[in-house]
């Protein structure tokens, strides 16, 4: 087993990382930052998502374990005081990983280039100081002509992130559905959109055709300035992000702990 540790640089995190490294070294665990089997992240959700993008080309062979040292962690199963238990579980348990759907983003430029991205949570298309004008297609059929600040397409687990703040539904990852939410759409006698989140089936796809030369696309919060894009296609990826199963909390327990209250009764959810 080859392991690497990704972390932020807060004092509490660095203390946890130092202890974790000593513990793994005592267990004769091999450290390999280039081709790891396990990526342990110490910090919060941002740390884990950054680590995913670092290893997204190896996503089919890498499992993630998140150690939480901040205030809120949706993807991080372990706390810094559980490190000993986590390492024992890592070395003793085998089994199928918990898998969550990823978002595949395919952007075609006017020059004919194709660019691909993967997202754990979401991708948004928007303009900063002007209205975004775009045509939205579902399965290559025109659905609406959008006018507004932007559009957000999310995965099921991403439905608890930016999409939720836009009024989107929270979706269980077993559904493997895409959700699109509007960002401040313009609706009047001239411009009309659905003005509600939409959820589409796993075998469907959403295409956004911008009617502007310049806009911003975000992928898990990372900003990309885009010029002369012909269209952006979103679909559920054939790849998944994989988490080590031991200690992995059920989805609705995560939602409850993140947004409603703390609970120790995690087994009541499936």
Curated annotation (Swiss-Prot):
Membrane-spanning intervals of the chain: none
UniProt GO cellular component terms: cytoplasm
Places the protein is found: Cytoplasm
GO molecular function: ATP binding; metal ion binding; NAD binding; NAD+ kinase activity
EC main group: transferase
Keyword NADP: yes
Gene3D superfamilies according to UniProt: Probable inorganic polyphosphate/atp-NAD kinase, domain 1 (3.40.50.10330), Probable inorganic polyphosphate/atp-NAD kinase, domain 2 (2.60.200.30)
InterPro entries: ATP-NAD_kinase_N, ATP-NAD_kinase_PpnK-typ_C, NAD/diacylglycerol_kinase_sf, NADK
Superkingdom: Bacteria
Active site: 45
Positions contributing to NAD(+) binding: 45-46, 121-122, 147, 149, 160-165, 184
Principal localisation: cytoplasm
Any GO BP annotation: NAD metabolic process
Record's keyword terms, sorted: ATP-binding, Cytoplasm, Kinase, NAD, NADP, Nucleotide-binding, Transferase
Catalytic activity: NAD(+) + ATP = ADP + NADP(+) + H(+)
Cofactor: a divalent metal cation
Known EC number: 2.7.1.23
Biological function: Involved in the regulation of the intracellular balance of NAD and NADP, and is a key enzyme in the biosynthesis of NADP. Catalyzes specifically the phosphorylation on 2'-hydroxyl of the adenosine moiety of NAD to yield NADP.
UniProt family annotation: Belongs to the NAD kinase family.
Protein name: NAD kinase
Taxon lineage: Bacteria, Bacillati, Bacillota, Bacilli, Lactobacillales
Gene designation per UniProt: nadK
């Amino acid at each position: 087993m080859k392991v690497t540790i990704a972390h932020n640089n807060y004092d509490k995190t660095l203390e946890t990382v130092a202890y974790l490294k000593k513990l793994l070294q005592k267990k004769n665990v091999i450290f390999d930052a280039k081709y790891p089997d396990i990526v342990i992240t110490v910090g919060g959700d941002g740390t884990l998502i950054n680590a995913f993008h670092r290893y997204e080309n190896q996503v089919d062979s890498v499992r993630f374990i998140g150690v939480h040292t901040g205030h809120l962690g949706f993807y991080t199963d372990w706390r810094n005081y559980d490190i000993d238990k986590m390492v024992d579980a890592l070395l003793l348990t085998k089994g199928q990983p918990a898998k969550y759907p990823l978002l595949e983003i395919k952007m075609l430029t006017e020059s004919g280039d194709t660019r691909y991205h993967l997202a754990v949570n979401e991708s948004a298309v928007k303009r900063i100081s002007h209205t975004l004008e775009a045509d939205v297609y579902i399965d290559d059929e025109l659905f609406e002509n959008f006018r507004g600040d932007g559009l957000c397409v999310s995965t099921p687990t991403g439905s608890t992130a930016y999409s939720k703040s836009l009024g989107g539904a929270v979706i269980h990852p077993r559904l493997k559905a895409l959700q699109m939410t509007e960002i401040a759409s313009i609706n009047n006698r001239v411009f009309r959109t659905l003005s509600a989140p939409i959820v589409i089936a796993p075998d469907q796809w959403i295409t956004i055709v911008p009617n502007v030369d310049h806009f911003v696309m975000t992928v898990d919060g990372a900003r990309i300035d885009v010029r002369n894009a012909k269209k952006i296609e979103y679909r559920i990826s054939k790849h998944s992000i994989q988490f080590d199963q031991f200690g992995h909390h059920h989805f609705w327990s995560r939602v409850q702990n993140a947004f409603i209250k703390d609970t120790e009764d995690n087994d009541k959810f499936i």
